[in-house]
């Protein structure tokens, strides 16, 4: 039986994903002693894991290097769809929010400058509102953009809001909820349908158990 290759997002989402996979009965023991390794093979099940950055999960899945990926909905919303989004894993929960300084006027967005790491998401949001804004893409810490006068407001993902508070920003609009999703390569789903749906069934059961805690 061919081993399923699963691409995981490095960092906190990786830890949450591994915990959920373990609960679903997937052998993740090879990842206990990671050191600098990025590829891991199970000794007891036909499964292997690849650790990559969030934005690269989709690339590995798209090109079939990974059969399955676990990545945040924020990454999926920003990129073109070239996969099947199969399951909301209900981990890594946060939210897209619009935030700015206390003197910001949210009643009129006309010609406002919005800084964000997610220009596609921001464009969609303001298009739905019928607002004409200028969107600036920033790769680093967007929180300082309104403080330094680069932008009138920001759009970013928010979990607790502590970083915004530390930089003197307030949340003015809560936009889209985010959580980690299971995505599958289109060709892999045809070739490994039984294996993949078995994994999905196991994960769904684990998610249900988490809900009842």
From Swiss-Prot:
Gene: hisG
UniProt entry tagged with the keyword Phosphoprotein: no
Record's function text: Catalyzes the condensation of ATP and 5-phosphoribose 1-diphosphate to form N'-(5'-phosphoribosyl)-ATP (PR-ATP). Has a crucial role in the pathway because the rate of histidine biosynthesis seems to be controlled primarily by regulation of HisG enzymatic activity.
Lineage summary: Bacteria, Bacillati, Bacillota, Bacilli, Bacillales
Protein name, per record: ATP phosphoribosyltransferase
Quaternary data: Heteromultimer composed of HisG and HisZ subunits.
Pfam families: HisG
Pathway(s) served: Amino-acid biosynthesis; L-histidine biosynthesis; L-histidine from 5-phospho-alpha-D-ribose 1-diphosphate: step 1/9
Species, as recorded: Listeria welshimeri serovar 6b (strain ATCC 35897 / DSM 20650 / CCUG 15529 / CIP 8149 / NCTC 11857 / SLCC 5334 / V8)
Compartments, record wording: Cytoplasm
Keywords tagged on the record: Amino-acid biosynthesis, ATP-binding, Cytoplasm, Glycosyltransferase, Histidine biosynthesis, Nucleotide-binding, Transferase
Catalytic activity: 1-(5-phospho-beta-D-ribosyl)-ATP + diphosphate = 5-phospho-alpha-D-ribose 1-diphosphate + ATP
Main location: cytoplasm
GO BP term, example: L-histidine biosynthetic process
Origin superkingdom: Bacteria
Listed GO CC annotations: cytoplasm
Top EC group: transferase
Segments forming a coiled coil: none
């Amino acid at each position: 039986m061919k081993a399923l290759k699963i691409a995981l997002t490095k960092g906190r989402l990786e830890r949450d994903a591994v915990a959920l996979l373990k609960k679903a009965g997937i052998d993740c023991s090879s990842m206990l002693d990671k050191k600098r390794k990025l590829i891991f093979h199970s000794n007891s099940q036909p499964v292997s894991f690849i650790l990559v950055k969030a934005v690269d999960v989709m690339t590995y899945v798209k090109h079939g290097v990974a059969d399955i990926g676990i990545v945040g909905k924020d990454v999926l919303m920003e990129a073109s769809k070239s996969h099947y989004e199969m399951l909301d894993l209900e981990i890594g929960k946060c939210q897209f929010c619009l935030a700015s300084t206390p003197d910001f006027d949210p009643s009129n967005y006309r010609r406002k400058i919005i800084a964000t790491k997610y220009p596609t998401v921001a464009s969609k949001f303001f298009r739905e509102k019928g607002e004409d804004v200028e969107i600036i893409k920033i790769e680093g810490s967007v929180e300082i953009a309104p403080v330094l006068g680069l932008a009138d407001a920001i759009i970013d993902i928010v979990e607790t809001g502590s970083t915004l508070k530390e930089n003197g920003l307030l949340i003015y609009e809560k936009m889209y909820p985010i959580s980690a999703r299971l995505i599958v390569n289109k060709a892999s789903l045809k070739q490994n349908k039984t294996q993949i749906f078995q994994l999905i069934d196991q994960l769904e059961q684990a998610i249900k158990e988490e809900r009842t805690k």
